[in-house]
Regions:
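Short polar/acidic secondary-structure junctions
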Residues: 60-61, 97-99
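Extracytoplasmic
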Residues: 41-43, 50-52, 64, 87-89, ...
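N-terminal post-signal-peptidase region of extra-cytosolic proteins
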Residues: 28-45, 50-51, 71-95, 123-127, ...
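Exported/periplasmic cell-wall-interacting domains
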Residues: 99-187
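Sec-dependent N-terminal signal peptides
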Residues: 4-12
């Protein structure tokens, strides 16, 4: 009987410890990291890494902050046409910012730009997409529905091609990005 209790304690105790340990490790990846609360210094730029699910901010001193993000399609492929739910890759700029009734804040990117139009035309010429396909638009960085930040924690890609952040993170980013801020998106 003693062996049974010892086995039960060791088995369940180690399971609980392993579960709690992995949650701690995962949560550190899902939180934002900021160099200083004072805000960025000088010109700001953004680099979004689709493979790592990260949006990083750089200023005149170098790295400033990294935020967890999610995208559209789980394939993480480059946007080919409207409706494919992929997030475009390339070099963009912020063209507008607004408070959004559904997604907290919306930071608009200049998609499609010349670079994305050229990739779209090449794909049409090669027959990779239908000849009547549209390039799409309305791509930006935004928050989630109220109380849906867990989508970011779970790396649940849910957008139509935009970049989604936790609401508190998009509010933070919104404070210091301006029209003309450069945004690079890559895999």
């Amino acid at each position: 009987m003693k062996n049974y209790f010892l086995f039960t304690f060791l088995f369940f105790g180690s399971s609980i410890w392993a579960t709690n340990s992995s949650k701690t490790m995962m949560s550190s990846v899902k939180n934002r990291f900021v160099r200083t609360a004072a805000g960025p210094t000088g010109k700001v730029s953004i680099v979004i890494d689709k493979s790592d699910y990260e949006l990083s901010v750089y200023d005149n001193l170098g790295w400033y902050a990294t935020y967890p993000v999610v995208f559209g399609n789980n394939s993480l492929g480059d946007k080919k046409m409207q409706g494919d739910k992929n997030t475009p890759e390339g070099h963009f700029t912020i063209i507008a910012k607004r408070v959004h009734p559904k997604w907290c804040r919306f930071i608009s990117l200049n998609y499609p730009n010349e670079e994305s139009r050229e990739k779209f035309a090449q794909r049409k010429r090669r027959g990779e997409i239908p000849s009547n396909a549209s390039i799409g638009g309305g791509i930006g960085i935004h928050g989630t529905w109220p109380h849906d930040d867990y989508l970011i924690d779970r790396y649940n890609n849910w957008t139509e091609g935009c970049i989604s952040m936790k609401n508190e993170d998009v509010i933070d980013l919104y404070r210091y990005v301006t029209n003309g801020t450069e945004v690079t998106i890559h895999k």
